[in-house]
Regions:
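Positively charged n-region of N-terminal signal peptides that target proteins for export
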Residues: 1-4
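Ligand-binding pockets and gating/stacking loops
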Residues: 19-414
């Protein structure tokens, strides 16, 4: 079987079996702040209380030999539908560099901002995607500036929905809003038309015009109408923001949106980690298990890659002392990701960490850039030539700006 690279993570050295079908969509459930791998996908029940903390228990999954954290009983019933990467690593313990590594596949520095994977897919789909919704959507907001287009340009950045999916009526801020009447919308479109006189990509203007009009007046806004779902379905996902965002993500994939970023916050648990996890882990368990099961039942799982993880993990050793009171710090040396769908075989564990979870023992997985490797599972070749050209343009612009600034400084000094 030809080596394939995971879309988004693109893990070096990772090779999961895939079938012939290519993925059409990606859903990234991004746990912003960094989830604890020892409490989720790589538990260490024999490592002692300083490692497992308040969660000594593990759950045997429906796949022999695979165990996960005790707070994820629903996910334990479907381990045959997903695989776990237990040895993701980039070594950074800083949020910004961690986000940048996992969202763009590159290390920070060098004066060039690389595009996020969602932006890369949006760029690849620029000529073939004819949907009325944006190609790259974040629920409800992108996790950082690195979700933008980088050197590809801002027209490929994430469209952030805003709003509250868990509310009785979910309204996408500034777009799907019942208070926006036709007159106000026509005024907005008139303002948008005025931008055509500015040096802005006309393709982007046309795209914005069509997308906004369809959002306001077209049938597409019904995709965000969760009242069309039965209460039993909404309860299955959980009434949390994460749960309802995952439900919207399923509806977006059904509508053909290529990339959906579901961002959930609160995972940066330096203090009172276990008190917070008592609520957050059951919410994740409901949301993610319902999403995978729902996609599978609707025949969408094989064509949709589902990924779940954060910018890094958390320290295996619990910080019991004040002021942390049972917290976990940042940890980029070893962390875990869940991968489902898209033709990837389920029921597998990739990599092995040490007994305490502090070191990678087998098959480290590091993020790499999509311009260096093709998004094989997504049916695309590398962006190498395009990326090189655009990086040169970006570097030339940066150099010209620095030279101009130096010139101004020289004039001021004389």
């Amino acid at each position: 079987m030809k080596r394939v690279y995971l879309t988004i993570i693109l893990t070096l050295g990772l090779c999961l079996g895939v079938n012939a079908q290519r993925a059409k969509s990606v859903i990234l459930v991004y746990l912003d702040g960094g989830p604890a791998q020892t409490d989720t996908f790589d538990p260490k029940p024999e490592a002692g209380r300083n490692i497992y903390g308040n969660y000594k228990g593990v759950i045997k999954t429906n796949v022999e030999g695979i165990e996960i954290g005790e707070k994820l009983p629903l996910l334990a019933t479907m381990a045959d539908k997903y695989s776990l990467i237990r040895t993701m690593t980039h070594g950074s313990n800083a949020h910004e560099t961690g986000h940048y590594a996992m969202i763009t596949g590159d290390s920070s520095g060098g004066g060039v901002v690389y595009p996020s994977f969602g932006a890369v897919i949006s760029y690849m789909k620029r000529d073939s995607y004819n949907g009325i919704l944006p190609c790259y959507i974040s629920l409800t907001s992108a996790n950082s500036r690195f979700n933008e287009g980088g050197f590809l340009g801002n027209e490929y950045k994430s469209f952030d929905t805003g709003g509250k999916p868990e509310a009785k009526e979910y309204e996408v801020e500034g777009v799907v809003n019942k208070q926006v009447n036709r007159q106000r919308m026509e005024q907005r479109m008139s303002l948008l038309n005025n931008f055509e006189t500015q040096p802005i990509d006309k393709h982007h203007i046309d795209s914005l015009r069509g997308v906004n009009m369809e959002f306001i007046w077209g049938d597409s806004r019904e995709i965000f109408n969760l009242q069309e779902e039965s209460d039993s379905v909404r309860q299955r996902y959980g009434k949390s923001r994460l749960g309802q965002s995952c439900l919207v993500a399923r509806r977006l994939v059904e509508a053909g949106v290529p990339f959906v970023n579901v961002r959930t916050t609160g995972w940066d648990t330096h203090k009172k980690h276990f008190q917070k996890m008592n609520t957050m882990l059951p919410e994740l368990d409901k949301a993610l298990s319902a999403l995978i099961a729902d996609l599978d039942a609707r025949g969408l799982l094989d064509s949709t890659i589902v990924l779940c993880g954060g910018e890094f993990g958390r320290t295996p050793a619990v910080l019991w002392e004040a002021p942390w009171n049972g917290g976990r710090a940042h940890f980029g040396k070893v962390f875990s990701y869940l991968v489902a769908g898209g033709g990837f075989h389920g029921g597998k564990v990739v990599g092995k960490s040490s007994e305490t979870g502090e070191k990678v023992l087998e098959r480290p997985g590091t993020p790499v850039r999509p311009d260096r490797h093709g998004l094989s599972a997504y049916g695309h070749r590398p962006l190498r030539h395009t990326a090189t050209h655009l990086r040169r343009q970006s570097a030339d612009t940066a150099l010209a700006t620095r030279q101009q600034q130096r010139g101004r400084t020289t004039l001021r000094n004389h």
